[in-house]
Amino acid sequence: MWFKNLTLYRFNKPFAVETEALETALADFTFSPCSSQDVSKFGFSNALGKKGSSLVHSADNRHLICVTKEEKILPGQVIKEALEEKVALIEDEENRKMAKKEKDALKDEIITSLLPRAFSRRSQTHALILPELEMILVDSSSATKAEELLALLRKALGSLPVIPLSFKAPVESNLTEWLKLGSAPLPFEMQDEAELKSEADEGGIVRFKQQDLKEDEVLAHLATGKQVHKLALHFGQSIALLLQSDASVKRLKFSEEFRAGNDEVGTDDPMARLDADFALMGSELVALMHALVAALGGLEEAQV
């Protein structure tokens, strides 16, 4: 359940859906496994996984939701070879060239015949709805997966006025300034990894890892006009992260010491531990968002 990435969105209007109403809305779009002829299925599932019993898990007016996606695995090469074999057979028997429309229809038939025997894979994406911040945090490094979750949530609720998080000043401008100064605003602490990009169309990209970012070798790239687009940070003693210029957070990791705060909770009750972990994670992510917005100079004014 501990989030590992953050794709960030904000509401244009206050989110005022209560837990019970949210649960009811999601219930019409619950996940069900693929049938023999389904290519994929997508829907809401228990927020706390197999041990959970509800689509929404809430604490302190913070709501955790989860979507599950199942996809049939049909390798393109398998389809291509089957199609070529079938086309060659028909063209040889009928002594003619098949039209593109016929080949497309034949391809659909082949896919239909292969689906019942295809393996499938499942993936899950969680999101945290934070009415107090008017934000949604999606635990995904993929903007596409985040948008899929939001699209289904929008369908369930009827509307979902959200936009990607954006700041008054470009994130890369702030990251570049921090690197020049040799430190990030408290409670953030700069680590030993960064990615710098030239603003020129065909400019270069330089990556530093396990290196002192205050060294002249690093700062020299700033003098040539490069800007920082990725920067590794620590948030206090609780979270390590990689902040990117698109305002997304990658490689989010809660420290063992921080997570150990719940070690004595739920030793005999796994649900109690999950509930405690969610409350702990939620409160720290709220603190992280407050600090991040302040460090980056505030959010851009929302367009209603």
Curated annotation (Swiss-Prot):
An example GO CC term for this entry is: bacterial nucleoid
Q: Is-annotated flag, keyword Cytoplasm?
A: yes
The places in or outside the cell where this protein is found are: Cytoplasm, Nucleoid
Recorded GO MF terms: double-stranded DNA binding
Instruction: Please tell me whether the keyword Cytoplasm is annotated for this protein.
Output: yes
Q: Its GO biological process terms?
A: DNA recombination; regulation of DNA recombination
Per its UniProt record, what HAMAP family does this chain match? Answer: RdgC
What does the function comment of this entry state? May be involved in recombination.
Q: What is this protein called?
A: Recombination-associated protein RdgC
What species is given as this protein's source?
Shewanella baltica (strain OS155 / ATCC BAA-1091)
Gene name, per UniProt, is: rdgC
